Amino acid sequence: MKRHGVCNTSGVALTRYSERLRFRTTHYGNGNMATSHQSCCGRRLDFYTGPGKGWCFTSLLPVLRRYCSASSSSTTAVAPVQAHGEDLYVSHYAIPEDAHRLVGTPQLLPRSPAEEVAFKKSLIKSFPQACIRNVSVVAHVDHGKTTLADAMLRFSNLLPADGATGTFTDRLQVEKERGITIKAQTCSVLLTLRETGTQYLVNLIDTPGHVDFQYEVSRSLRASEGAALLVDVRQGVEAQTMAQFYAALEQNLTILPVLTKMDSVMNDAEVEKTLLQLEDSTGLLSREAVLTSAKSKQGIEQLFQHIIDKVPPPRGRAGFSDMKQLPIMHADSAERKQMEKELVPLRALLFDCWTAESSGMTDGAASAPASAATSFSSVSSGTVTASGGQPVAREGIYGLIRVMDGTVTPGTMVTFCHSGKKHEVREVGIIHPTLHPTAALTAGMVGFVFFPGLTKRDVFIGDTLCTLPTRKHTVRVGVSNIPAAELGTEPTATAELASSDSFAVEPIPGFKTVHPVVFAGFYPDEGVYITQLRDAVDLLCVNDPSVTMEQLQCPTLGPGLQLGFLGFLHMQVFKERLLMEFGQTVLVTPPQVQYMYVEQHCDPGDPAQRKPVSVSNWRWPHEGVGAYLEPFVTATVLTPTQYFSEINSAALSSFRGEMQEMRVIDDARTLVRYRMPLADLARGFFSTVKSSSHGYATLEYDDLTYMAADLVKMDIVINKARISALSTICLRHEANTHARRIICSLKENLLRSSVDLPLQALVGSKIITRETVKAYRKDVTAKIHAGDISRKQKKWNDQKKGKERMARRSVGTVTLDQSVLAAAMGATTAR
């Protein structure tokens, strides 16, 4: 009977053991410990050395071997193990029950310099790149990515087998409430092939499926060599399935076709139809597809085997990257000089960041199952090789990196290529399945680093982290053990140190710059300072780098922020995260799409000559504008055939849609594509599709282009004061309709006062709609019961003159409750 054990820097052991075992732990000094286990079949001792002190069990090993060889009744198994990423030794012994009487207290001796060097190198060689696999799980919305990822973690004994499914990798509260994946989450799994005994490190990245979070998917694919393309066996290939397939194909990844929810299949014909559809759409061979079910655990083992067999290992140069990672040696020693020559400049891709406040990493650490032993034919589960738990909240930023070349350890001084600034790494580790610190991250690994002094201004997602070499060092294609033909045209690393201390590092190709397509103003709730909202948005933007932010100043609502998003769901999720994670209740203005304009005598078809225009920087044609441009998208709707007629009628008549393609997928489903203004899609087409199809239809949009449009800016004036929060950009022929809705909403919700409140909608200087909120009037003639009518007229005239004086004093002064503004803003999105 064997057990795996680990020891971290504080001397805490994280063990997975049989239920029959009883254990006792004894500490020896700082960070050193020995653990003895006893069972009904005998006693076994596992000994550990702590990190940082250079200890070994040199004196203990001869005692054990001498006793075990002298005992004829003992079964001896001596197997030193170096746990990956931990500065420790783990030794396993199966010895008789009375062995503890002869062992006594182990004598801990310092390692020799040669042993220290060998031990440091073992950190690098414990997981060679050939035994690492990085895989992203991609699919359409609700095709079972998160549920399957959870099943894979439970199969690997990282999560309890009897726990709730489909919840662990969805760490954010908004993800759990909406039932969708918003943030890509990473988890490292250790697997051991039973036939060869080779241990593999598999990094799984669970990605979102909605188009609004495609930026999360693209970043995850950049850190992977393979992609598991999931398809719901009942739903088949859908719009976002193809989008994810092309994204993985663009990154030249190995794509593994996987069918999910096999437990819901009624007959084999349904499976064959989906496999044929997948092969026709993507070209992936149907015989290579893995049939899985997270509910019944079908195909999980086969999927792991496919990942190990078919996904290529990462490429890059392994080795130490910093002199601090080397053991202490004499500065003039030949061995030190030789190790300096073998230094490999660090290159790591930063593809995600978070703070302690804006991540779900502290939520629900998984409890270890009772037994780590998993019995299956070809792949046996690995064990936790790093201790850890829930991270404590602290100042700083966590970064998720993929190490391309070299090694990063705590204390490594890394340089951010984008800003050129240096920052020290305080902690490194893997996510297994929560944050577990390790001693190093080597080439090919995916893990986290913690920077205690880093701020949002210093972070650029997609940046390259590197180390400055201490000598002139150039690494080019073909100099490593990997042939140049396999590396392609991209150099592995290039780092040169000139006499002027300047350096050049070949940056890792980052991510495409994303441009927001939806903008909205965020204003703090009544009684909340703008600084609190700004700080919360800053922290959240660390975890969501696709959001843009600008300062706003509204005379009615006060200071606020204009935020840009990748879609409408993205905006709603961001608002919910502000409330759930930071307690910030905000008033959100109606979403506006990004309009453009070109100056006179400029080509509207040239993207370089387009300039953004909004209500805050609006320019009229007489101010040099040649043409306004409106964003159009291709909306793809996949709907049950019985709902197609109603959806098509609404798209053509109410949302300015133009049908481009209609295709019958099968007997029950129809796919249709429309060319549609993004503004109309924002004003309710998505809701119309969902309500008309009772939630069965799906809608995705992409292919953003700009076309000429006759746009105007419409302002709302209350008591001769412009309300900038209600200003909007719309088509000229729709201005009257939008104005009437807003003015009527204001008239219904505004409280009457002692003076009349004129409500006006203006396009330029022209009033297109006007209403008046009548004032309260006191009955000044209540005490006049008889006499000449002129007595009453005199009172009425005096009252009228008094109200005119009050109106002159109150011009431009109006106080609006946020509920009134919210109702008016809701009227702008009504159809």
Curated annotation (Swiss-Prot):
It is found in: Mitochondrion inner membrane. Its main location: mitochondrion. It comes from the Eukaryota. One of its GO terms (molecular function) is GTP binding. GTP binds at residues 139-146, 206-210, 260-263. Its EC number is 3.6.5.-. GO terms for biological process: positive regulation of translation; translation. Promotes mitochondrial protein synthesis. May act as a fidelity factor of the translation reaction, by catalyzing a one-codon backward translocation of tRNAs on improperly translocated ribosomes. Binds to mitochondrial ribosomes in a GTP-dependent manner. This is Translation factor GUF1 homolog, mitochondrial. Residues 130-315 form the tr-type G domain. Gene3D superfamilies: 3.30.70.240, Elongation factor 4, C-terminal domain (3.30.70.2570), Elongation Factor G (Translational Gtpase), domain 3 (3.30.70.870), P-loop containing nucleotide triphosphate hydrolases (3.40.50.300), Translation factors (2.40.30.10). InterPro entries: EF-4, EFG_III/V, EFG_V-like, LepA_C_sf, LepA_CTD, LepA_IV, P-loop_NTPase, Small_GTP-bd. It is an enzyme of class 3 (hydrolase). Keywords: GTP-binding, Hydrolase, Membrane, Mitochondrion, Mitochondrion inner membrane, Nucleotide-binding, Protein biosynthesis, Transit peptide. Residues 1-68 form a transit peptide. It comes from Leishmania braziliensis. It catalyses: GTP + H2O = GDP + phosphate + H(+). PROSITE patterns: G_TR_1, G_TR_2. It is a peripheral membrane protein. It holds the Pfam family LepA_C. GO terms for cellular component: mitochondrial inner membrane; mitochondrial matrix.
